[in-house]
């Protein structure tokens, strides 16, 4: 291919590009409708531009804001139920979901440990006793489905 040299080639620019910017264009308007639209355009050009606020966020900030909006919407849909009249000193903290339902004693045998590894996953095992039904780990299918739908939209927006 040929190498292009700027001094060999001269570009011819159209007249509107070479004309100074201070000149006003004369618009020939044939109909009244065109006159009105031309007047609107001139009026819009002479007005001061509207102020706009532009927010720039990084990805982490956008995810935080999106999750905050989803959580806020959920709170408005289902307001928190008031706890029953129980003394604050008698409230028990529920164990975290990642904690195993089986507790091992210091003298447990290896057979017990093997049987624990063969048991189904925490979320798939049926709830045991009245305490398990109030546990945050055991959720109704509707709650899980709603949360999954909300997170689906977040994933779709940010990771596609």
UniProtKB/Swiss-Prot annotation:
Molecular function terms from GO: damaged DNA binding; molecular adaptor activity
GO biological process terms held by the UniProt record: DNA damage response; double-strand break repair via nonhomologous end joining; immunoglobulin V(D)J recombination; negative regulation of double-strand break repair via nonhomologous end joining; positive regulation of double-strand break repair via nonhomologous end joining; protein homooligomerization; protein localization to site of double-strand break
CC annotations in GO: cytoplasm; DNA repair complex; nucleus; site of double-strand break
Pfam family of the protein (one): MRI
Residue ranges of the motif XLM: 150-160
Keyword list, A-Z: Acetylation, Chromosome, Cytoplasm, DNA damage, DNA repair, Nucleus
UniProt-annotated stretches for the region Disordered: 78-152
Record has GTP-binding as a keyword: no
Function per UniProt: Cell-cycle-specific regulator of classical non-homologous end joining (NHEJ) of DNA double-strand break (DSB) repair, which can act both as an activator or inhibitor of NHEJ, depending on the cell cycle phase. Acts as a regulator of DNA repair pathway choice by specifically inhibiting classical NHEJ during the S and G2 phases, thereby promoting error-free repair by homologous recombination during cell cycle phases when sister chromatids are present.
UniProt note: domains: The KBM (Ku-binding motif) mediates interaction with XRCC5/Ku80 and XRCC6/Ku70 and recruitment to DNA damage sites.
Quaternary structure, from the entry: Interacts (via KBM motif) with XRCC5/Ku80 and XRCC6/Ku70 heterodimer. Interacts (via XLF motif) with TRIM28/KAP1, ATM, MRE11, NBN and RAD50. Interacts with splicing factor SF3B1. Interacts with ERCC6L2; this interaction is DNA independent.
Protein name: Cell cycle regulator of non-homologous end joining
Species of the source: Rattus norvegicus
